[in-house]
Amino acid sequence: MSYYVIIRGPLGCGKSTLAERIAKTLKAKYVAIDRILDEHDLTKDKEAGYISQKSFKKANEIIAPKAARFLNKGTPVVFDGNFYWKSQIDDLIERLDFPHYVFTLKAPLDVCIERDSKRRKIHGKDAARAVYKKVTEFDYGAVIDVTKPLEESVRKILLYLPNLKFNKQNHFNLY
């Protein structure tokens, strides 16, 4: 069974780390929406101070056919992004007619700022605050508290997905 996963949340909440771990566990294709935006020069068009809905929909238009090829071959796809426009999520779901699971990651702003300050490419407090404000305007899908250890958050997400079972060591196996 083929499906895709959307991991959304504020800057610094651990989206990429979590999405990459989920993708590795599922042997899925990992897609970083920010990378698509950067590679196709889609970050300049602004709407209310944020990257525009139009830019995100263009990113969806670019990546959806590639994702569909993986999905048609039975390979799951994991999307990682802020997804701060609901229209962007709806557009991606409309473009990819496959089973899907959406997760909104939650962490307090101070946790996001602290995590951002510890990475190689720091975005800064102002960017973290701005993205946090926009992303937290709505929840979509299952809400996951990511203030817990990484493995606990991974486990919570995997419990929602098909074809997974625990082995005796409480690790997931694909079936």
For each feature predicted by the language model, list its residue ranges:
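Small-molecule kinase domains that catalyze NTP-dependent phosphoryl transfer to phosphate-bearing small molecules
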Residues: 118-158, 163-175
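Walker A/P-loop
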Residues: 16
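Conserved phosphate-donor/acceptor-positioning beta-strand/loop module used by diverse small-molecule
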Residues: 96-115
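Hydrophobic anchor at the beta1->P-loop junction of P-loop NTPases
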Residues: 7
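Conserved substrate/cofactor phosphate-moiety recognition/catalytic segment
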Residues: 20-68
